[in-house]
Regions:
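Conserved acetyl-CoA-binding loop-helix of GNAT-fold acetyltransferases
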Residues: 81, 87-101, 125-129
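Conserved GNAT acetyl-CoA-binding A-motif
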Residues: 102-115
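Short hydrophobic/aromatic beta-strand or adjacent loop that forms the aromatic wall/cage
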Residues: 48, 145-150
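Conserved beta-strand-loop-alpha-helix junction that forms the acyl-donor binding cleft
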Residues: 112-123, 141-145
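Acetyl-CoA-dependent GNAT
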Residues: 3-77, 82, 95-96, 101, ...
């Protein structure tokens, strides 16, 4: 199955459905006060770029966003792949697209907050395989047992001709 990844607006019904599935997945993993959800409306803000993965039928099967906080700092947000494509490296391709865009924009660091526990083990493996290392809290995230924080120093920016469409076979 071929997967394509492109920058899209989050204000689409199938993307809203992905966000709902992500929220349902996260709900039992930590108390609500430690779930830092972005709504699709917040994801549509000009500081955020959303990548959507679609299968060969056009169905939205994954997403991940880059939120730019400053000229130096970006944050990975709302990473999710549908269970139907897990294990097919869709999450890795989404994360690579986010990292590439952060580098192209000249950011020096990419950080993320994710949950802890068994339900997040796959996510932690993805981030560490992609070069992210554990770190302490950043921005206004509190230090808690429910959060794990990761960082990827980006170094020298690279340029890519087309960051709006990426294919994964």
């Amino acid at each position: 199955m071929a997967i394509s990844i492109a920058v899209e607006t989050p204000l689409q019904d199938d993307v809203r459905a992905l966000v709902a599935r992500l929220n349902d997945h996260l709900l039992p993993l930590s108390p609500l006060e430690f779930q830092w959800k972005m709504t699709v409306e917040q994801m549509a803000d000009s500081s955020t770029t959303l990548f959507v993965a679609r299968d060969d039928t056009g169905a939205a099967v994954g997403m991940g966003a880059l939120k730019v906080h400053s000229p130096e700092l970006g944050e990975v947000k709302r990473m999710y792949t549908d269970v139907s494509v897990r294990g097919q490296r869709v999450g890795s391709a989404l994360l690579s697209a986010i990292v590439d865009l952060a580098r192209a924009r000249g950011l020096s660091s990419l950080m993320l907050e994710t949950g802890t526990g068994d339900g997040m083990a796959e996510a932690h493996r993805l981030y560490t395989r992609s070069g992210f290392t554990p770190r302490g809290p950043f921005l206004d995230y509190p230090d808690s047992q429910w959060s794990a924080f990761f960082e990827l120093p980006l170094g020298v920016p690279t340029s890519r001709d087309n960051l709006s469409e990426i294919s994964v076979d």
